[in-house]
A protein has these predicted regions:
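Catalytic core of pol beta-like nucleotidyltransferases
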Residues: 1-17, 21, 33-39, 50-214
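Short, glycine- and small/hydrophobic-rich beta-strand elements in well-ordered beta-sheets
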Residues: 21-29
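N-terminal loops that bind phosphate or other acidic moieties
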Residues: 44
């Protein structure tokens, strides 16, 4: 299992050596950021520079090529102005899921208002609804369905924040806050009954689309 604190220190040292004062933010997202990582979980790192060019990306790729667990590294690389100009409905999850190690997301986070969060919920539910129908008719994939259920968790995080002003990162803690109808979506772990699981997710997303529409 990865010692993520040790690994992130090595990553930060390497980024400082590579980009120096151009670094605006370094952070960690995903299962490692939430303390829910398993063996083989991706390392979702965030690197925000003053700007990003093709040369920067080549430098970045070269810098991380020799790191341990290179095959697990993914995440988000961006220039700071692009991030500030990003759609705020999308920025909601980004900001609240990121554990910042260098720099701060506070300025960007403070620009996100209640309607941006509503749009995050609505757009997420719309994408799940479409993905569920497409998968039922065309792909018929349990793996895709599993991914859609994972997306539903992020929508539920946004919905809970919209209703309470509290962001809950960990799945188990989120499950404990949900009413039975929503909790059944979070608790699904097996996808052997494809039709029933698809039906449940489709009905859940349809209800949310209607509730959160402008």
């Amino acid at each position: 299992m990865i010692d993520i604190n040790k690994w992130m220190k090595e990553y930060c040292d390497l980024m400082i050596k590579t980009f120096g004062s151009r670094i605006e933010i370094i952070g960690l997202q995903g299962s490692h950021g939430r303390g829910e990582a398993k063996e083989g979980s991706d390392i979702d790192v965030v690197l925000i520079l003053d700007e990003v060019t093709i040369d920067d990306l080549e430098q970045y790729n070269q810098a991380i090529s020799g790191m341990e667990f290179r095959d697990l590294i993914c995440g988000f690389v961006s220039g700071i102005e692009e991030l500030k100009s990003w759609d705020k409905a999308d920025l909601f999850q980004f900001c609240y899921d990121t554990e910042t190690i260098l720099g701060s997301l506070d300025e960007i986070k403070s620009s996100i208002d209640r309607d941006d969060i509503r749009r995050a919920v609505h757009m997420g539910a719309c994408n799940i609804y479409h993905g569920c129908i497409h998968n039922m008719v065309h792909d018929k994939s349990a793996e895709i369905l599993s991914g859609l259920y994972k997306s539903a968790r992020f929508v539920q995080q946004a919905l809970y924040f919209y209703n309470t002003g509290v962001y809950i990162k960990k799945k188990k803690e989120l499950e404990d806050t949900m009413q039975a109808y929503d909790r059944q979506i979070l608790e699904v772990k097996e996808f052997n009954n494809f039709a029933d699981k698809s039906k449940s997710l489709l009905e859940w997303s349809k209800k949310l689309i209607e509730e959160m529409r402008p």
